[in-house]
């Protein structure tokens, strides 16, 4: 376990999946969902080179079939620590003989964590090390405890978006695939989304044209989590039915669109990266 620590926060990160496992304040309050039990086992996985699920678990490149599990290679792990200090850690996932069987590109996917006061900055660095154009999507999947404070309950919490927005909601199947149906998604005063009373909420809300800053909060406590995600086109909000956590997931792409071409380059929200080039993305988590 890699530990980042200052007088405000202690952040514990597992090497294998470069995954935040714990974020604690100075008084010992845990903000991250701890996984396990009857609910989701993860805490904050990183998603690459796809987000979500593929139809029938495969895609094609020039007609050749490749099988790849939900959320891609990084969800399965095998990262290595390449830098670790008291306030910064960098993890890297690279291609291997095994990965080339399901994703035929030579690549580097780095996840860099930087701790500054009560702010965690997460950078994704994608490098195409191949001699051809590489296609990918990526995203974050952090899960936070709800309630954040003792004595509270899930129904007291809501999302407050910094900017007014009129997002588009995607209809998803029970397996998390996109049906192709989209419609306006209502927010209270264009900024507020309660965690309860939304039939569409369970299990996932998937939004486009969303504000790029959101706070998970309650009027019953001063504790909150704020995320920014400039450069991520989509936002997924996921919650296991009756579970005591919520995931805030900025993504650059989408799950598979039913009936779409199976070619990876035609996948909804896919990014094309030329040979030898690098892309970078950043999101932040602020703990209060």
Q: Where are the predicted features?
A:
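Beta-strand-rich N-terminal accessory domains
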Residues: 1-61, 65-68, 210-231, 277-287
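Acidic, contiguous internal or C-terminal segments within carbohydrate-active enzymes
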Residues: 4, 95-148
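Extended, loop-rich substrate-binding clefts of extracytoplasmic carbohydrate-active enzymes
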Residues: 64, 69-117
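Hydrophobic residues positioned within well-ordered beta-strands of beta-sheet architectures
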Residues: 89-91, 109-111, 122, 138-140, ...
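Beta-strand-rich interaction surfaces with strong enrichment in secreted/lumenal proteins
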Residues: 110-112, 203, 268-273
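Active-site/ligand-binding surface loops and adjacent short beta/alpha elements
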Residues: 146-229
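Active-site pocket scaffolds in enzymes
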Residues: 223-288
């Amino acid at each position: 376990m890699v530990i980042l620590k200052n007088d405000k926060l202690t952040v514990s990160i597992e090497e294998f999946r470069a995954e935040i496992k714990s974020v604690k304040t100075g008084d010992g309050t845990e903000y991250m969902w701890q996984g396990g039990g009857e609910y989701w086992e993860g805490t904050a996985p990183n998603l690459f080179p796809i987000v979500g699920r593929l139809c029938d678990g495969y895609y094609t490149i020039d007609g050749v079939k490749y099988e790849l599990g939900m959320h891609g290679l990084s969800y399965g792990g095998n990262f290595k620590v390449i830098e670790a200090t008291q306030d910064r850690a960098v993890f890297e996932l690279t291609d291997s003989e095994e990965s080339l069987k399901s994703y035929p590109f030579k690549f580097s996917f780095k996840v860099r964590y930087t701790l500054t006061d009560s702010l965690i900055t997460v950078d994704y660095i994608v490098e195409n090390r191949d001699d051809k154009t590489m296609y990918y999507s990526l995203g974050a999947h952090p899960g936070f405890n709800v309630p954040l404070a003792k004595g509270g309950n899930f129904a007291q919490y809501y999302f407050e978006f910094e900017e007014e927005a009129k997002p588009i909601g995607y209809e998803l199947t029970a397996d998390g695939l996109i049906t192709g149906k989209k419609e306006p998604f209502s927010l209270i005063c264009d900024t507020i989304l309660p965690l309860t009373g939304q039939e569409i909420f369970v299990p996932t809300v998937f939004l486009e044209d969303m504000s790029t800053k959101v706070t998970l909060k309650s009027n019953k406590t001063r504790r909150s989590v704020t995320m920014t995600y400039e450069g991520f086109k989509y936002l997924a909000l996921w919650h296991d039915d009756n579970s005591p956590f919520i995931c805030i997931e900025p993504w650059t792409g989408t799950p598979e669109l039913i009936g779409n071409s199976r070619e990876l380059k035609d996948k909804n929200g896919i990014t094309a990266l030329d040979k030898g080039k690098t892309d970078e993305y950043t999101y932040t988590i602020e703990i209060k």
